[in-house]
Swiss-Prot record:
Record-linked NCBIfam families: D_ala_D_alaTIGR, PRK01372.1
GO cellular component: cytoplasm
Top-rank taxon, per record: Bacteria
Name of the molecule in the record: D-alanine--D-alanine ligase
Location of the protein in the cell: Cytoplasm
Co-factor remark: Binds 2 magnesium or manganese ions per subunit.
Cofactor(s) named in the record: Mg(2+); Mn(2+)
Catalysed reaction equations from the record: 2 D-alanine + ATP = D-alanyl-D-alanine + ADP + phosphate + H(+)
Entries under PROSITE patterns matching the protein: ATP_GRASP, DALA_DALA_LIGASE_1, DALA_DALA_LIGASE_2
Sequence similarity: Belongs to the D-alanine--D-alanine ligase family.
């Protein structure tokens, strides 16, 4: 029996970030899964009145399914701490550090993890970024520092593409990060309660695993377990656990990598609130271990707590 059986569970979803649509799908799926496990669930679309809604619904525990700003940056976690409502996932500080790629990349390097060369530019300077500003040259990847789900991310192969890519990334949250493109196999690792569950290989139909490839069914192939040497699998799972611990994460995370031909796992980011939709990777990995989606959600809920 779950710790929270018989308690009023709020699944927090939606919000107003660029990842709202993904969050709506994640929240709906998780709410249904928790109901299948017998929980008393209310869905709460997060807005400026969320605190009043939580009080009115007499919520006793929160299942956070809120992607992007407000949900993954520590904001909703801070509110829940102040209301003394236990919640799933990482706390305020870990969420904020995981969401800010500039901060998390520095932490990864301090842990001795492999990080592709990169440069950080203020949003105001994005329109003036040129190839001469990049010691690693092209190809490169441009991304906003404070977004997830590959929102605003571009693979740049030619100098003429760099300016438009940087200007687009500057329209989102945070500074603009430009990093060296690493050729290799895209591998994501699910970590639950500090333990790596498994590594899944991602093969998008196009050259780049962008937002459409992540959330459009049939556009990407997944292979579990990942089709890389066993030694490389062990290395990437160990790196994922180190990143999870280093950021100070709780509950479930998804850690994204590019594994180079020599087996070096270049870490891209830690997702403190990974997607939980029909096409999401954490449920795929869990299913490969025989853990059903309702059971996975129940495990995540069971770890709900105040972190401060």
């Amino acid at each position: 029996m779950s710790t929270w059986t018989g308690k009023r569970v709020a699944v927090l979803y939606g919000g107003r970030s660029s990842e709202r649509e993904v969050s709506l799908r994640t929240g709906a799926a998780c709410a249904e899964a928790l109901r299948q496990k017998g929980h008393d669930v209310v869905l709460v679309d997060v807005d400026l009145e969320v605190a009043a809604r939580l009080r009115a619904e007499r919520v006793e525990v929160a299942f956070v399914a809120l992607h992007g700003r407000w949900g993954e940056d520590g904001s909703i976690q801070g509110l829940l701490e102040s209301m003394a409502i236990p919640y799933t996932g990482s706390g305020v500080l870990a969420s904020a550090m995981g969401m800010d790629k500039t901060v998390s990349k520095a932490i990864f390097r301090s842990l001795g993890l492999a990080v592709a060369d990169y440069r950080v530019f203020p949003r105001a300077a994005a329109g003036a970024i040129g190839v001469d500003d990049l010691p690693f040259g092209l190809p490169c990847v441009v991304k906003p520092a404070g977004e997830g789900s590959s929102v605003g991310v571009h693979l740049v192969n030619a100098a003429a593409e760099l300016g438009p890519a940087c200007r687009d990334a500057a329209g989102y949250a945070g500074d603009v990060i430009v990093e060296r493109y690493v050729k290799g196999t895209e591998v994501d690792v699910a970590v639950l309660e500090g333990k790596a569950l498994g590594a899944i290989e991602i093969v998008p139909a196009n050259a780049f695993y962008d937002y459409a490839a992540k959330y459009t069914a049939g556009t990407t192939k997944y292979f579990y377990p990942a089709r890389i040497p066993e030694a490389h699998v062990r290395a990437v799972m160990e790196a994922a656990e180190a990143a999870h611990r280093g950021i100070g994460c709780s509950g479930v995370t998804r850690v994204d990598f590019i594994v180079a031909a020599d087996g070096t796992p270049y870490i891209l980011e830690v997702n403190t609130l990974p997607g939980m939709t029909a096409t999401s990777l954490v449920p795929k990995i869990a299913a490969g271990l025989g853990l059903s989606f309702p059971d996975l959600c129940d495990r995540i809920l069971d770890g709900a707590a105040l972190k401060a």
